[in-house]
Design a protein with these regions (language model features):
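PRPP-associated nucleotide enzymes
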Residues: 1-161
C-alpha cells in the first residue's frame, strides 16, 4: 500500500452480500433453535432479512445503536432496544460488520445470552462476535451497496403527488 493510500477499498455487490449472508445462515442453522432475529440497524438489516428467510425465522426486531459519525468511531448510543428478549437466550443478533466490536459489546451488555453474528469481522472486532464468515484487515474499508455513495445504491423514488 502506498504512503498516500490510508486504507484498502472493498466494494461489495448485492449479489456478494446475499451469498455471504446465506453462508452465514448455513453456519448458524445448527446453532439454534432461534426465537427470533435482532438486526442491528442499519447495517445489519439486509443481512438479518436474508438470514431470517434462509432459517425460516418470522420474528424480527431491531436494536438501534449509533456508533459511527462520518468515518470515525465514537461512543455507542442506544436509540432503541428490542422488546421481550430478556437476557437474549435463544436470540440471534446480526450486523454486517464487527469493526472494533463496540456495537456488539454494547448489545451483549443488554443481552448476554444472545448469539452474535456478523458477515465480516476486523481483528479488533472478532472477539465480540460468536460467528462470522470473513475476516478483513483493519485497514480495509468495506463499501456496502446500500450506502448512498456507492455505485450500486439505488435512491428511493420520489413520492407521486
Amino acid at each position: 500500500m502506498s504512503a498516500a493510500q490510508k486504507h484498502l477499498d472493498m466494494p461489495l455487490t448485492w449479489e456478494e452480500i446475499s451469498l455471504h449472508a446465506q453462508s452465514l445462515a448455513l453456519k448458524l442453522a445448527d446453532k439454534g433453535p432461534w426465537k427470533g432475529v435482532i438486526a442491528i440497524t442499519t447495517g445489519g438489516m439486509v443481512p438479518a432479512c436474508i438470514i431470517a428467510r434462509h432459517l425460516k425465522i418470522k420474528h424480527i426486531d431491531t436494536l438501534c445503536i449509533s456508533s459511527y459519525e462520518d468515518q470515525s468511531q465514537r461512543k455507542t448510543n442506544v436509540i432503541k432496544k428490542p422488546e421481550g428478549t430478556g437476557d437474549g437466550d435463544g436470540w440471534l443478533v446480526i450486523d454486517d460488520l464487527s469493526d472494533t466490536g463496540n456495537t456488539f459489546r454494547t448489545a451483549r451488555e443488554m443481552m448476554p445470552k444472545a448469539h452474535y453474528a456478523a458477515i465480516y469481522a476486523k481483528p479488533a472486532g472478532e472477539s465480540a462476535v460468536d460467528t462470522y464468515i470473513m475476516s478483513v484487515s483493519t485497514d480495509t474499508w468495506i463499501h456496502f451497496p446500500w450506502e448512498e455513495n456507492e455505485s450500486s445504491y439505488i435512491a428511493p423514488k420520489k413520492p407521486v403527488a
